[in-house]
Amino acid sequence: MAAPGFLPRPDFQHLLTALTAAGYLCLGPKVRDGAITYEELGSTDDLPRGVHDHQQPGAYRLHRDESPRCFSWANGPQALKPLLFAPRETLWTSAAGSDGGITFHPEIPEALPTAVIGVRACDLAALRLQDQHFLEGPSPDPHYGIRRRNLFLVAVHCT
């Protein structure tokens, strides 16, 4: 893992352009249906500026102001998990052999290289736990592994 660094705002678009040129689908925070969700980013202009959240038990509301800040909210209702686990997928197929036996063939998904902009420390901590279980355990999950290897994360500091 690379050492953390600071990316000045004028260089942020260069990062998105480089990731896109390298074949990554760039996802980042956007406002949809009153919540912050990860969606495709075309440019840094797509990032919501001046959006803040107010959370309490049973409530989640977004508010806007004139602030130029792009990441001034806590985590939204969406996490990284949907990017790593498909709701349904074929794990294997089988075929009957001429000898009457059955042959099983694993189905390994193709994963699009995906860059996620705006990941929080709590997301990284949860991802580490998933990695321990699904990559480093006694039976690594190849489906999780291929998606995880194709994931590029850009974290932001929670203040």
Question: Which stretches of residues belong to each language-model region?
Answer:
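Iron-sulfur-associated redox domains of electron-transfer enzymes in respiratory
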Residues: 1-159
